[in-house]
Amino acid sequence: MRASPPSCIISMPDTSAPHSVMMALGSNHADADALIEKAIQLMSRFITDLITTETLTTEPIGIQSGPFRNCLVTGHTVLDASQLIAALKKTERDCGDRKSLRRAHIIMMDIDLLLHDDRRYHTQDWQRSYIQQLLPQTNISLPPLT
């Protein structure tokens, strides 16, 4: 005699549903473009569906240094915000970023989480001209902060 199929199937919610994320990347090192490419490659380990904007040359904000190269990156991750921030900080270190270099105004790699699902981070950065210029190149459809 065969067992009859269960009368109901209970499914658990998918707790690993991907989160939409956006990060700002920047470097003022002579090899900034190569470092940005390296950071994107490293981030592909924990962020999928990566979309990268063009990379712009910008003037430094808040430090005396040479120009920066900046871009935005969007994608999806199963990491929560705190896990993602930790992974981004490790990516910065893997790109050579060190506190001692930052004290000398050399930023090998700076990665700021700007968006995790609907939560905005670094809200003061959203008004920066390069972020406003690059936002239309992303798949993010949020209105700018007012």
Where are the regions a protein language model picked out?
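Flexible, gly/pro- and Lys/Arg-enriched active-site loops
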Residues: 7-8, 30, 60-69, 77-146
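A structural signal for alpha-helix termini and helix-coil/disorder junctions
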Residues: 45-49, 94-97
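N-terminal beta1-alpha1 ligand-phosphate binding loop
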Residues: 2-46, 53-59
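Short basic (Lys/Arg) and small-residue
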Residues: 73
